[in-house]
Structure formats: structure tokens, C-alpha cells
Amino acid sequence: MVQAVSTSGQKQAFAAAIAGRPYFQALLGRDLALWADNPGAPTRLFTVDRAALAVGGTTAQLCGDPGDWEELDSFLRFVGVQALTTSRVPPAGWLLRRNLFLYGLPAGRVLPTPPLPSGLTLDRAPSVSTIAQELFSDRPERWDHFYSETCTALAHGFARVVALRDPEGRMVSTVGAYAMANGEAYLAMGETMAPLRGRGIGGWLIPTLANELAGEGWNVTFLCEESRRHFYERLGFAPMGQYGQYEMKTTGI
């Protein structure tokens, strides 16, 4: 049964479902802390049998076994979800959109860091609006969700975002720990301006933030697609597992 998280018992059940589950314990742990008691939140939280479910816009995250996949399918379709990221393999009929590979850096470990590219400076408080514009200029609904979610997480200590700027002050690269909870910091949105890619900019910024977080006692994680695995392994991150993002099943007429 799908139940919205509102009571203390439901919050405990949600927390139990994500405990010890890399990626989910950070992302959904942040969401539980920020949104469980906020009816106007951009992310809605549910328990599904012994699983935890977070729905934000047209995407959802599922941690654990929902039991009745047909009920879950109907619910996700009703609330407008188009893509589901999960640690489980759904029944036949769900369409795999992409495999997502989990990588990490354990607390206390240190990655080798190349020299900072010449002329660039580190910005520890970049404009969230500027980052949203760079990442989602063609998706205004995603822009709004990202901006609201990130500003709230930063204000409450559940996120940390950094950027690099060129001598003219323009942001040329960014990455962030957008979910920090339960001892885990989840990295995402690592981007460098297209004309500057291949110059080692992201290869400096990402390990720098990861080392900082690991040095503070955080286990650092992130998800990436197949095409990016070599890059992150070259930086020294260790593979930890694999999840999947699935599309909603098509229905007949």
C-alpha cells in the first residue's frame, strides 16, 4: 500500500527502508529531513510496503521492495511520473532507460589532485540561479525544482556547492554535494562549459570537493552512466554497485 509519509511511525519506516543503502540514504535522507512535514514541498515522500518512495515532478526514486508492482505502477502513472530510479529490477514490461553506476570515496580516503588549472579561482558560494540556468535553460520546470530544492538544502546544511571561475569572473565549472545525510554526501551536476572540456578542470574540481568531504568524515557517492565510468575510475573513485532508471510501461488502448 502506498502511504504518504506524515506520522512519526511512517517517518521511522521510511528511514528504516533507506538505512545503509548508498545513494538512497543520502538523497532520500535529505528529503525526509526537509520535506516530510511540508505539504508544499517539491518532493513528496511515501512508504510502499517496506520500501521508500520519493516523487519530484516527473521522476521518482524507489529504495527497497514495493511488494505489489502493479499498485506502484498505477500510483506512479496517476501522479505523472515518467522515470523511476531504483535498486530493484522491476517485473517484465518496465523499460530500462539507462544503467546508473554507483561510485564512491570512503570517509578518510584521499584522491590524487592535479594542479588547479591556471587562471581559475574556487568559488565556495556560487549562485544557484546561475547554475540552474546553465544546467536547465531548456527545461523551465526542472529549473524551478532544482532551484527551490537546492536553496532549501543549502540553507539547512544538507548540501554544498562549489564552482570555478575564470579571470573575468565567469563560472566555467561546477559540482555539488546536493544531498548530505546519514553520513553520506551524494555528488551530482558536475559540469564544465563545453568549450573548456578536456582541460582537466572537472578533474581538479570533483576530487577537490570529494577529498574535502571525505576528510570531514563523509562517505562520498555519485551515480554515472557507462560513458563516464572511465573518467571517474581514472580519478580514483571506486565502483560500488549498479542501479537502473526505468520508463513507465506503455499501456494498450
Label the predicted regions.
Residues 96-108, 238-253:
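Conserved catalytic-core motifs of GNAT/GCN5-like acyltransferases
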Residues 77-88, 213-225:
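Conserved GNAT acetyl-CoA-binding A-motif
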Residues 88-97, 203, 226-243:
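Conserved active-site alpha-helix within GNAT-family acetyltransferase domains
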Residues 56-61, 179-188, 197:
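A conserved beta-turn-beta hairpin within the catalytic core of GNAT-like acetyltransferases
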Residues 40, 142-191:
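A conserved beta-strand-loop-helix scaffold within acyl/acetyltransferase catalytic domains
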